[in-house]
Every structure is written in structure tokens, then in C-alpha cells.
């Protein structure tokens, strides 16, 4: 009517071909109805995204597991549903990594292709020899050129991550004791013996490594570093940082990806989180910052503070 077209959510009403102009698949339950054009936004909700890890999955994914457009699958969007109160409009763009996500999906939808859907390698860059890594590293280089050339003065928090390499242990069972000490604290090795069992070490690349994704409990979980992460376990991750000179630098560190649509509480002062996480640099323990948010009542009407990097 009046030249307007209607887009409806899927899942939603069970439309038949000819009853609606287009549908947006917003949930993992969404499936194409033949004869209706669809937009794919499954797991594209940037308000749940980590700045680094989720961008890998977003760039590498096939649109609805297809390599090119069809009559029934015509494109894709990122969705930003920020349910927490905001102190400034700029924070909505910055906290949800909007511009990097926009550029990643714009290139993917323009080129088509991709090597996986969200349930392939997920958010992981395992090693430099894979096509996934090479393609993402090339995109990252182009994106950072755009950041310097076209996004000066805009809230664009992303920095290079393809040079960040980690060694991460298998998770040790802690029996609910989050302060329990395990062999990696005595010295770093390629593997560890603990209570008659061997615990290995694997490598991963990136500035954000999920041990368990926010969508990890869904029937179609997004894969992370651990295939089947369990509660009451302790893991160790370590990396090498080189400085060509003695200097003071800032540090971007977080142990939890704060969704901007949940009522998560800030950590208690003097702690990194509610899981007993700890950080060291050259064997010197790093204390957490003073958290700017101090509320103890869960609410979407209280803005996130500096606990949300």
C-alpha cells in the first residue's frame, strides 16, 4: 500500500509466498520459506559481540550457508539491540563495535563466499596457515586503512589482533575452589601432569578468545576454544609482548564479554570478575582497575561502566 513494502520477522508469523514482501531471519530457528526473499541476521546481534572474536566469525561466515545470492536469500544485516541504558549516543556505536562489524559484513555480502556458517570454526583463528586466517588478516589490513583514512574522529575501537598469539592449557577441574593453584603457576610447559592425568597446551590467535560463547548453550552453539566447556574449571592462557624500548603503555584487558543487553553486575572492587580470574605480567600480578559502576541491583536502567571494554 502507498508504495511501501513489509518486512516481517522469521520466526514469527507463518507467511506463505505472496503474503509478505521480505522476511528477516533473526533467530537460529529461522528457516527460508520458498518464494519469499529473506535477509539473514542469525547471530548478528552486535550488542552481544566481543570486539575481536565475533568479528572473525562475522567476516568468515557464509550468508545462510550460501556462497552467493538466491531468489530466496537476498542479503544480510547486523542488528544492534542495545537494551542497557547509555550515557551517550557515541557509546552505542563504540561499545557494540558498530563500524568494524559494518565493514566486515559489507565486504562479505558484496563478495559472497565465506568458508563456514556460524557453527563451523566459530570465532576462532587457530593458526596462520589456514585460509580463514589469511583471508581475515587481509581484510583486517584493509579495514585498518579505512579506520585511519575515513574514520578519524569516529568511535572505532578496533586494533590489529592477527599478531596476538596465545598458548592456552586444557582446563583443570577446581571442584568449585576458584583460588586453587595448578601446575602452570609453577612454570610454563608444553604439557602438565596433574593427579595422574596429562593436560595439554594449544595455540590460538586473536585479541579475544572465547572459552564459552554467550550463545554456547543454544542447540546450535557457536564453537569456541573449548569444545565442551564445563563449570568449576581453571584454564591458563599466556602470550608474549615485546617492546623495543622501555615505556609505559595502556592495557586493554577483560575476562568477560559484557553483553549490552543483559543485567550483568560489575565485578566487586579488587576483583576482575566473579570467577576468580587473575592476570600477571612478568610474574607481577596486575590488580584490576577501580570499577566505575558500583551498583549491586541488576537493572537495564543503569549504564555499564569501565567493566565493559
What are these regions, as identified by a protein language model?
Residues 226-243, 300:
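Short beta-strands within extracellular/lumenal beta-sheet-rich domains
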Residues 240-283, 309:
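Aromatic-lined ligand-binding clefts that engage carbohydrates, nucleic acids, or primary amines
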Residues 293-309:
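Short, surface-exposed tryptophan/glycine-enriched loops
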Residues 1-21, 28:
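Active-site neighborhood of glycoside hydrolase catalytic domains
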Residues 143-225, 291:
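Accessory carbohydrate-binding/adhesion or oligomerization-edge regions at the termini
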Residues 26-84, 96-97:
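Aromatic-lined glycan-binding groove of carbohydrate-active enzymes
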Residues 5, 12, 88, 101, ...:
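Carbohydrate-binding surfaces of carbohydrate-active enzymes
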Residues 285-287:
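Short hydrophobic beta-strand segments in globular cytosolic domains
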